Amino acid sequence: MEFIVFLDRIEIEIIRIVEEAGYSIKENSSLCLLSEKYAGFLIKKDKKIVICTDNAKKREGYTNRSNQNIDIFERTAIHIKKALRHEAVHVAQECNNGNLLEINKKLSINKAKFDALRGSKDISGEEEKERQAYILEDKPKLLKEKLEKYCL
């Protein structure tokens, strides 16, 4: 899986918990071809996260690691890490019997994510779960805690 090179230690720990919970992680499935704007999916019935590495690379202008400036690599990494974390929030929600996670009500979604929230809601039909995923994708330590609480 190519996307691993873009991750930090906390995302590797998140993957371990997700896999312990019985989920698999795949890369660049046919779902990614729906649109280059999609960076990840959770296929609930198959217990599978899909990371659209190629879409993230195209979106950020990444071609290859040896011929790249650090800024493009970092932007691509952020895109992939957030996609993994976002889908991992949905895993935690599934581990919580499909319910929202208990988080501080004062946490709010970054306004820059409103368009993405609309797109995700259109696919999943679950606005509050998507809102929570967009909030927690920026909080990897809190996400890890929630995965441990609900999935292990």
Language model features by range: what are they?
Residues 6-27:
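Zn2+-dependent metallopeptidase catalytic core
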Residues 41-45:
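Extracellular/periplasmic catalytic domains that process cell-envelope and extracellular macromolecules
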Residues 87-104:
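Catalytic Zn2+-binding segment of zinc metalloproteases
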Residues 56-84:
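Short pre-active-site segment immediately N-terminal to the catalytic Zn-binding motif
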Residues 8, 74-83, 123-128:
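Soluble non-cytosolic domains of exported or imported proteins
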Residues 30-38, 104-111:
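Acidic helix-start/capping segments at beta-turn-to-alpha-helix junctions
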Residues 102-152:
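Metalloprotease/metallohydrolase-associated module, dominated by Zn2+-dependent proteases
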Residues 48-53:
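Short, aliphatic-rich beta-strand segments
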